[in-house]
């Protein structure tokens, strides 16, 4: 039964009966995020979406005193791309791993989306040209940033925290070489299945409580019920990657996970509303928005 199909008398019973039935079927992460997207359509923007921009996100993270990769201050056409080692090449306006390349050396380059090695700089440019021709990358505008390594020859794994205003709900750990694998974690350190990537799971390394606390603290500084905070794991600490207000394929979680994350979202909305009513100012966020004239 979908949430909109639950009759009012059942909702009423859930609120009034001494042995009230659970109303958990009434919530859905998928549905709540859909509503959030409709809010964005109607209002033009939302607080978390203002951070869905690398320069803005990096400025926010710098305000908080956290580490981020070095990033070029300009974008490049493919023909103008500087030949450098130990860099990441990304589409300037892209998301996900399409068009992303890890350049360890001029003859040691990894195509992140295809999970394969590109043999030379010339082959790299051919592959990028193909990305443009097929529409994988929309515009011939590329950015360059520091290559973060987990150790001397292993690219950083991705650590993605699904944050619900001050509380991490789920954690996704991803390794991308030699092939892409995924591991879902709860905040209590249990590996779980969520319905996403069930055929591509591995036993990850997990995260520390300090790392969970870091994600919790950042999300408390953003006036939004949900945002995913993505990091790269370097040798000694997490390095900020990006804010993701709308995770890809968020409709693929199984029903149990979708319902549970719906509860997380709904509780977060309540906590955020209470904090706003109590006058919370979100100083770092508002200061940045004022600086940027948003």
Name each model-derived stretch.
Residues 115-197, 238:
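Phosphate-binding site of ATP-dependent enzymes
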Residues 135-141, 184-238:
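A long amphipathic alpha-helix within ATP-dependent nucleotide-binding catalytic cores
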Residues 2-3, 42, 68-75, 84, ...:
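Catalytic phosphate/metal-binding cores of nucleic-acid and nucleotide-processing enzymes, i.e., regions
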Residues 101-106, 164:
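Short beta-strand-to-turn element immediately C-terminal to the catalytic PLP-Schiff-base lysine
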Residues 2-8, 12-16, 24-31, 206, ...:
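C-terminal active-site "lid" helix and adjoining low-complexity regulatory extension at the edge
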């Amino acid at each position: 039964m979908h949430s909109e199909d639950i009759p009012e008398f059942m909702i009423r019973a859930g609120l009034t009966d001494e042995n009230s039935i659970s109303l958990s079927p009434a919530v859905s992460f998928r549905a709540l995020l859909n509503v959030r997207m409709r809010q964005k359509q109607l209002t033009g923007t939302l607080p978390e979406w203002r951070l869905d921009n690398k320069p803005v996100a990096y400025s926010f993270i710098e305000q908080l005193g956290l580490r981020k990769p070095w990033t070029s201050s300009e974008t490049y056409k493919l023909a103008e791309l500087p030949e450098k080692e130990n860099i990441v090449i990304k589409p300037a306006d892209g998301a996900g791993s399409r068009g992303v390349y890890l350049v360890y050396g001029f003859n040691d380059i990894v195509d992140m989306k295809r999970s394969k090695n590109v043999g030379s700089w010339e082959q790299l440019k051919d592959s990028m040209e193909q990305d443009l021709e097929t529409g994988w990358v929309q515009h011939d505008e590329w950015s360059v940033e520091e290559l973060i390594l987990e150790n001397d020859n292993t690219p950083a794994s991705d650590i993605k925290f699904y944050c619900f205003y001050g509380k991490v709900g789920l954690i996704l750990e991803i390794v991308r070489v030699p092939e892409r694998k995924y591991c879902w974690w709860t905040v209590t350190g249990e590996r779980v299945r969520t319905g996403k990537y069930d055929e591509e799971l591995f036993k990850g390394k997990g995260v520390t409580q300090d790392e969970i606390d870091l994600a919790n603290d950042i999300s408390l500084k953003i006036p939004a019920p949900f945002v995913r905070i993505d990091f790269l794991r370097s040798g000694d600490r997490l390095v900020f990657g990006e804010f993701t207000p709308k995770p890809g394929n968020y409709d693929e979680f199984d029903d149990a996970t979708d319902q549970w994350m719906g509860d997380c979202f709904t509780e977060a909305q309540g906590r955020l509303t209470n904090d706003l009513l109590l006058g919370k100012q979100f100083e770092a966020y508002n200061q940045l928005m004022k600086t940027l004239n948003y």
